[in-house]
Design a protein with these regions (language model features):
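A short beta-strand element within beta-rich, extracytoplasmic domains
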Residues: 6-29, 139-144
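Eukaryotic cytosolic interaction/assembly regions at protein N-termini and domain boundaries
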Residues: 1-4, 9, 32-35
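Exposed low-complexity, polar/acidic, P/S/T/G-rich flexible segments that act as propeptides
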Residues: 27-51, 124-165
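Extended, solvent-exposed segments with strong compositional bias
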Residues: 50-135
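Core nuclear transcription-regulatory modules in eukaryotes
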Residues: 16, 33, 43-44, 80, ...
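Short beta-strands within extracellular/lumenal beta-sheet-rich domains
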Residues: 1-6, 23, 119-128
Length: 165
């Protein structure tokens, strides 16, 4: 078997998003820093895919407690894909490419600059999600909004995965 087919067979993942927030905010107009709408990614390994039709997120936890504002499901995850620009009514187009050779550390100045200028998530810049993707895995993209007045208007989203063949 050829080495490129066994070690890290995924080469690139490309996300295309057309979205915008509700179009108003108290501050941060046109920036990513003031945005409370974003997209998270999750790689679901093939062996962990649910078999039943019910995969919804419960409103209350196992103890009957409602999700509070600091609940992990209500905050950007470490795998934040992209934020919307804050207070922009028109549709914005985002093109995010992850490559298996990416190698930007989440705690680097370069990652901070990319997050500030492009709205990308810091932890997705190191290429690890691409290198760890296996045949059969599923990529989920979650559109999120944090507060009641904030809304994430998603017009289109696509995910393309490129493999070594």
């Amino acid at each position: 078997m050829l080495p490129h087919r066994t070690i890290h067979p995924c080469r690139k993942i490309v996300f295309s998003i057309a979205s915008h927030d509700q179009g108003f905010a108290n501050s941060g107009h046109g920036t990513f820093d003031g945005s409370y709408t974003w997209f998270d990614t999750e790689v679901v390994p093939f062996e962990n895919l649910p078999t039943s039709g019910n995969s919804s997120i419960p409103e209350r936890d196992a103890h009957g407690v409602r999700f509070g504002q600091d609940h992990p499901l209500l905050l950007p995850s470490s795998h934040k894909l992209q934020a919307n620009r804050a207070a922009v009514r028109g549709t914005q187009h985002y093109h995010i490419a992850w490559h298996h050779l990416d190698n930007i550390s989440a705690d680097s100045a370069e990652a901070e600059e990319i997050q500030h200028n492009q709205g990308r998530g810091r932890a997705t810049l190191d290429g690890s999600q691409v290198r760890n993707l296996q045949i059969g895995d599923t990529i989920a993209v979650w559109g999120r909004a944090r507060f009641g007045a904030w809304s994430n208007h998603v017009e289109r989203l696509s995910v393309r995965v490129f493999w070594a063949v």
